[in-house]
Design a protein with these regions (language model features):
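Short, well-ordered amphipathic alpha-helical segments that serve as non-catalytic structural scaffolds
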Residues: 59-74
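Short glycine-aspartate micro-motif
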Residues: 16-22, 80-84, 160-164, 170
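Short glycine-rich, Thr/Ser-proximal phosphate-binding strand/loop in the N-terminal lobe
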Residues: 17-59, 98-99
Length: 178
C-alpha cells in the first residue's frame, strides 16, 4: 500500500509536458513544452520530402518516430499530457487535415484524383503512436493566434488580428478575449 501511495505521489509531482507540432509546407517543427510555454526540446522533419497523397503514411511514420525520439531525449521523467497540432486546413471537430493546398497532392496522371482521398486523419494517427494520448488539431493560423494570446506579444489583449505568412497565408482573430 505504501509503495502505491509513493508511486502516486511521485507521479502527481512529476512535470507535465505536451508536444506542440507546427506543420508547414516545407518543414514540420515540434517541441516539448510545459504549461508556461517553456520549451524543453525541439526538432524538425521535412514535410516536402512527402509531397504526394501516397506519401502520407510514410510522413506519419517519420513524424511519430521523430517525436518519440525527442520525447525520450529528456534526462528527466515527465508526464505527457497531450499533443497539439497546427496544420493548414485542419478541421478541429473531425481531427483531420482536409484538402490542404500545399500538402500531399496527387501525382501527375493519378488514376483516382478524388479529393476525398486528401482528407487525412492526422489527430487519430498521431494519438495511436503515443498510446492514445489526447491529440488535438486546429488550423495553423488559429493555433498561432492562440499561442500569441496565451504566451506571446498579445498576452492580455482582448482584441487583435494575427496574419501568418509561410508557405501559405493565414489569419486569426480575437474579439473580446475569444
Amino acid at each position: 500500500f505504501d509503495r502505491i501511495k509513493l508511486t502516486f505521489n511521485l507521479k502527481h509531482d512529476m512535470k507535465k509536458l505536451a508536444i506542440g507540432v507546427d506543420i508547414g509546407g516545407i518543414n514540420t517543427a515540434f517541441g516539448l513544452v510545459d504549461e508556461n510555454g517553456d520549451l524543453y526540446a525541439e526538432s524538425v522533419i521535412s514535410t516536402k520530402k512527402y509531397p504526394y497523397v501516397d506519401d502520407y503514411p510514410a510522413y506519419v511514420e517519420d513524424l511519430c518516430d521523430s517525436m518519440r525520439a525527442l520525447a525520450q531525449s529528456l534526462s528527466f521523467e515527465y508526464e505527457l499530457t497531450g499533443i497539439g497540432i497546427g496544420a493548414p486546413n485542419a478541421n478541429y471537430h473531425k481531427g483531420t487535415i482536409e484538402t490542404p493546398a500545399n500538402l500531399w497532392k496527387f501525382k501527375e496522371g493519378d488514376p483516382n484524383p478524388d479529393e476525398s482521398r486528401r482528407v487525412f486523419p492526422l489527430a487519430d494517427d498521431i494519438s495511436k503512436c503515443f498510446g492514445g494520448v489526447k491529440t488535438l488539431i486546429t488550423n495553423d493560423a488559429n493555433a498561432a493566434t492562440i499561442g500569441e494570446m496565451i504566451y506571446g506579444n498579445a498576452k492580455g489583449m482582448r482584441d487583435f488580428i494575427m496574419i501568418t505568412l509561410g508557405t501559405g497565408l493565414g489569419s486569426g482573430f480575437v474579439a473580446n478575449g475569444e
